[in-house]
UniProtKB/Swiss-Prot annotation:
InterPro entries: Ribosomal_Su5_D2-typ_SF, Ribosomal_uS5, Ribosomal_uS5_bac-type, Ribosomal_uS5_C, Ribosomal_uS5_N, Ribosomal_uS5_N_CS, Ribsml_uS5_D2-typ_fold_subgr. GO terms for molecular function: rRNA binding; structural constituent of ribosome. The N-terminal domain interacts with the head of the 30S subunit; the C-terminal domain interacts with the body and contacts protein S4. The interaction surface between S4 and S5 is involved in control of translational fidelity. Residues 11-71 form the S5 DRBM domain. One of its GO terms (biological process) is translation. With S4 and S12 plays an important role in translational accuracy. Located at the back of the 30S subunit body where it stabilizes the conformation of the head with respect to the body. The lineage of its organism: Bacteria, Bacillati, Actinomycetota, Actinomycetes, Micrococcales. This is Small ribosomal subunit protein uS5. It comes from the Bacteria. The gene is rpsE. Keywords: Ribonucleoprotein, Ribosomal protein, RNA-binding, rRNA-binding. Part of the 30S ribosomal subunit. Contacts proteins S4 and S8. PANTHER family: MITOCHONDRIAL RIBOSOMAL PROTEIN S5 (PTHR48277:SF1). Belongs to the universal ribosomal protein uS5 family. It comes from Micrococcus luteus (Micrococcus lysodeikticus).
Amino acid sequence: MAPRTTRKDQFLERVVGINRVSKVGRRFSFTALVVVGDGDGTVGVGYGKAKEVPAAIQKAVEEAKKSFFRVPRVGSTIPHLVQGEDAAGVVLLRPASPGTAVIAGGPVRAVLECAGIHDVLSKSMGSVNAINIVRGTVEGLKKLKSPQAVAARRGKALDEIAPHAMLRTMENDRAQKSAKAGA
């Protein structure tokens, strides 16, 4: 099933998967796994169940909006290598140079694109269950630390711990944000 992407109230919604379960005979129940983000570093994941598909998606979207969290980014990628795990699903996320794009499977791609990460390499290992992979990706993204936070924690200057290319990217991001704010 192709992922459905919609934009409501400036949020990007991606339906990762819909499952149909029959309880008794022809009584069906649907579950939906949805990722919601603003495309600028905020993302959340939700899981909804209902007797109709649209109701399940709506419940999942509401749950996803309640579980928003911030993802530190450097330019269009992540600051460092990270691994997230959930159940038997393991997701490895690696920063990539600009122009690489998102190299990831469907569930991981949905989370990263909704978070506004455009250049990253990923590898999913273990479980192929979409729920485990999405939760593993979220767990990995929650482990990310910004270069400023790492420098403050170590008691060092930012230029002592961050590569020069990363510092240039961060300066360019600040300049672009101030230009947008001034326009």
